[in-house]
Amino acid sequence: MTTTIPRGAVTITRRQAHDADACVEDTRRVLDHIRERDGRIPRKDKRISLQDVADVLGVDGVIWCLGALGEDRLLRMFAVRCARRALRTADVRDPRSWRAVRVAQWHAQGWASEPELSVAARAAAYAATSAWDAERDAAWGAAWGAAWDAEWDAQLNLLLTMAGYGPADTAVGA
């Protein structure tokens, strides 16, 4: 059963992956996954779904593909959305952090310059350092692992949705 690729979704071909020096082992794992499902390996110029990449390699593989394809704006907007989620989750109220994310979005959209982005990033770094110093002794360790796993899955789902795929089961290997 071949996977249907949504109209307008970002895809990659074997040739594009090869030309971008993809890891041979990771490529083989994705192709094996497709062969097990479809009974054959796709031709060099056949589009490969980023959902197939995600099923085998997770969010790291999808991010690599998007970088190899030159999808810099999509990756920047993904980073902005992840940063916003993190700020909301951590209940960050310092306006410098929120401004940095806003400027990063403007930069991704071509509305802010590199110097403006640098200034906002430095201010956010200072805010983060100040907050870390104030809350250093908080009990973060126990919840960190579970929270990271849940966030990783949420980020993969978000990235695939942004790349043109509908919300999907994000369990790697599922």
Region roles according to the model:
Residues M1-A174:
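Short, glycine-biased loop/turn motifs at secondary-structure junctions and
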